[in-house]
């Protein structure tokens, strides 16, 4: 069984083969035009009970406030036990001072991701479970100097690809994905909307499932991404693999 649950924006919990991964799922800061993880969910995590508590792995693609808040990660770790934390490359080192101190004090295992652009590194998380971080350019002209990790999770033979904010205009950057059997590929609305993104999804990645995420909640969407996603859902549904659009708080998608 595979289940995906939205926390907010590009934050999801992936459940596969009895393991739970929180990917970009712990953030609540900044003035970005994307939804924060609601305080009521963070408070539930503080109880140490419920579906989001005691996740196996915390994974972060890059150090942007709509993907990663060190203080929220530390808060989570004070109330929950995890096997390992996989941190992004930092843009502002002082953001992590307290988190790194807590990781050291509590001897919580962690690794630093954030691969240089065009390089990749694989980590074995446990037998049969691997994470590969692939350094890519961040999408958007205003962020072209920044990098973002494209994350591959391999869970006992099932392959999941999290593209987060990785650039999708250079098809060759995804040559690593050609021919792999993808259980699910996670893309943002701009990736899904673009012609190059469509080619990647249809001809290169060819996943069983497409998950479109990084969509603001209703009332928190100044850029109109919800309307764009709805338009594209109608336009492309028949020509692409099974697609789910994560637009609502705690929305889930489950499949065998």
Task: Explain the meaning of each model-derived region.
Residues 10, 29-30, 63-70, 92-95, ...:
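Active-site environment of divalent metal-dependent phosphoester hydrolases
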């Amino acid at each position: 069984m595979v289940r995906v649950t939205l926390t907010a924006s590009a934050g999801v919990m992936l459940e596969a083969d009895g393991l739970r991964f929180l990917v970009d799922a712990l953030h609540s800061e900044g003035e970005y035009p994307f939804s924060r993880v609601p305080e009521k969910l963070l408070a539930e995590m503080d109880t140490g009970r419920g579906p989001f508590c005691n996740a196996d792995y915390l994974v972060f693609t890059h150090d942007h406030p709509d993907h990663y808040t060190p203080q929220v990660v530390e808060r989570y770790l004070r109330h929950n036990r995890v096997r390992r934390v996989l941190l992004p490359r930092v843009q502002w080192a002082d953001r992590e001072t307290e988190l790194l101190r807590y990781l050291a004090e509590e001897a919580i295992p962690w690794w630093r991701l954030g691969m240089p652009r065009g390089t990749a590194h694989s980590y074995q998380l446990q037998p049969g479970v691997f994470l590969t971080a692939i350094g890519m350019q961040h999408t958007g002209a205003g962020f072209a100097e920044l990098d973002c990790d494209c994350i591959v999770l391999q869970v006992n033979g099932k392959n999941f690809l999290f593209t987060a904010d990785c650039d999708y205009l250079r098809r060759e950057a995804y040559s690593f994905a050609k021919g792999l059997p993808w259980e699910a590929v996670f893309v943002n609305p701009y990736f899904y909307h673009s012609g190059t993104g469509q080619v990647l999804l249809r001809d290169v990645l060819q996943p069983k499932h497409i998950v479109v995420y990084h969509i603001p909640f209703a009332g928190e969407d100044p850029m109109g991404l919800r309307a764009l996603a709805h338009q594209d859902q109608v336009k492309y549904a028949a020509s692409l693999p099974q697609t789910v659009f994560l637009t609502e708080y705690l929305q889930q998608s489950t499949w065998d």
